[in-house]
Design a protein with these regions (language model features):
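N-terminal subdomain of nucleotide-sugar transferases
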Residues: 2-5, 23-82, 87-89, 93
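Carbohydrate-associated surface elements
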Residues: 252, 272
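Nucleotide-activated donor-binding/catalytic signature segment of Leloir-type glycosyltransferases, i.e.
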Residues: 340-360, 372
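Membrane-proximal helix-turn-helix segments that form the acceptor-binding/catalytic region
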Residues: 179-245
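Short hydrophobic beta-strand element within catalytic cores of glycosyltransferases
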Residues: 395, 399-402
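Conserved donor-binding/catalytic core segment of Leloir-type glycosyltransferases
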Residues: 288-315, 330
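Conserved acidic donor-binding segment of nucleotide-sugar-dependent glycosyltransferases
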Residues: 413-424, 433-438
């Protein structure tokens, strides 16, 4: 698939290592990498999945990977967690608060995390060659502070649109208060290592001058129309500019970060999916007959930002527009909208049309529950920077329908279709287009089968190691 932002290739250090074996790239000296993240690794989701896959791939090449993350031993005793800290000595659980944030453990204040890590590793310089940071909250800030103190190079992966997380999830009267408070804590915590003047980077000895942001600029105004969203963009930009190297999973997100003032070198490297997840099965080409119900799979959080309820509304509208339209919608996942999903389905659909399965071990989803499906759905809009669900579906030759045109960059080889707008009616019309043209399913599935499997972690790790070597 062509890259809609390919004209920015000079700015984005997106290099191609096609055809090379990652084992041939492994240095004679194994790297010692510390990963800092605020994401709880014991839950499903794109970020924890990518961190797990990154750790597995690097260790397979002989590198040492230590992860600092929140959680307790009890959290990792969940049988669904195959990445438990109770049996992996290289997963270090930092001081963790007793309360949960969005149902997941959250680390304590940055100072406490810093003290804990320094107590465990008195001389970090002798223990690690570089840091890789995967978020922007307390543990991630601890990584930046320790990196500056011990002169260790840092890679920062910017995963998500935190501005949209606030805009979608925080009730209206509190959006500005929450965003301003988060940005204030972030700015204050990192004040000691922040520089007012731009600094050179390892690729360009001449520092780039930070331009003043013009919030009347149409593109910036569209991305940051409120004070709350401006505050979160400031936080994301600050975090990125304190690293030596920035990674984003997509070119469209890299472009937005540049727009808001990120001056550090940016590389576009997909989060990738684990090779092991698809190693033991051969996906088939999907076909859809016009007498069949359209089988659609959702495997993601049931949350506002993922927009499960607008998709259910699209299904309702599709049935209203075409009474003969039949479907079976399988929902895998859990989240704070589960009860609303159950109520909506009970009110509008018969039991045969909906299967709510809850949380299922990740590998089982790909190898078992995708088998008889026609479509996968990712319905987020201006939130996901990559959408790992798209890549996982692609690995199964399962066509994808989606609402956000930015996701077209991610869908391999035209293996999906985008609705004309994020409105439920537009998605309903797309569903009916497929219903009336069943041959589309086979065509899209064949496109995915013919695509290069560059989304596998084994391919992405080559690019990551290239960056690591430039820094270490």
């Amino acid at each position: 698939m062509s890259n809609p932002h390919s004209n920015n290739s000079k700015n984005l250090k997106h290099q191609n290592f096609k055809g090379q074996n990652p084992k041939n790239l492994a240095p004679t000296k194994a790297l010692r990498i510390a990963i800092f993240t605020d994401v709880f690794l014991g839950i499903p989701g794109g970020i924890p999945s990518s961190i797990r896959a990154q750790k597995t791939s690097l260790e397979a090449l002989g590198h040492q990977v230590t992860i600092f993350c929140p959680g307790t031993q009890q959290d990792f005793e969940n049988p669904l967690s195959q990445f438990g800290a109770n049996h992996d000595p290289n997963i270090i659980l930092v001081p963790t608060a007793k309360f949960l944030v969005n149902g997941a453990p959250f680390s304590k204040w940055t100072k406490q995390v810093v003290r804990f890590i320094e107590g465990k590793y008195p001389n970090l310089t002798e223990s690690f060659d570089l840091f890789h940071i995967h978020y922007e909250a307390t543990t991630s800030m601890a990584g930046l502070i320790l990196a500056k103190k011990y002169h260790i190079k840092t890679v920062q992966t910017m995963h998500g649109r935190e501005d949209m997380a606030i805009a979608i999830n925080v009730p209206h009267p509190f959006k500005t208060i929450a965003a301003t408070g988060i940005n204030l804590i972030h700015r204050t915590t990192l004040k000691s290592i922040s520089k007012k003047s731009p600094r050179p980077d390892y690729q360009n000895p001449e520092p780039k001058k930070l331009p003043g942001l013009n919030y009347q600029n149409a593109e910036i105004k569209n991305l940051a129309p409120t004070i709350a969203r401006r505050e979160m963009w400031q936080m994301m930009t600050r975090q990125a500019n304190l690293a030596d190297q920035v990674i984003t999973p997509s070119a469209h997100f890299a472009k937005k970060l540049r727009l808001f003032g990120v001056t550090r070198p940016i590389s576009v490297i997909s989060n990738g999916i684990s090779d092991q997840e698809i190693a033991n099965f051969t996906p088939r080409i999907r076909t859809y007959q016009d007498h069949e119900p359209l089988r659609i799979l959702w495997f993601s959080r049931l949350s506002k930002e993922k927009r499960i309820l607008p998709f259910l509304e699209a299904l309702r509208i599709a049935q209203e527009l075409e009474p003969n339209f039949r479907f079976i919608f399988t929902i895998i996942g859990d989240g704070n909208q589960m009860s609303k999903v159950q109520k909506f389905c009970k009110k509008h659909f018969d039991e045969a049309s909906i299967k709510i399965l809850g949380t299922i071990p990740h590998q089982e989803i790909l190898q078992k529950y995708t088998k008889d499906q026609h479509l996968s759905i990712i319905n987020s809009y201006q939130f996901d920077t990559q959408g790992l669900t798209i890549l996982e579906a692609a690995a199964c030759n399962l066509p994808v329908i989606y609402a956000d045109p930015d996701m077209s960059e991610i869908v391999p080889n035209h293996g999906g279709l985008c609705a004309k707008s994020p409105a439920p009616r537009a998605m309903a019309e797309l569903l009916l287009e497929i219903y009336h043209q069943p041959e589309l399913i086979q065509k899209l599935s064949q496109n995915l089968a013919a695509s290069e499997k560059t989304y596998l972690q084994s391919h992405q790790i080559e690019k990551l190691l290239k960056l690591y070597r430039q820094l270490s």
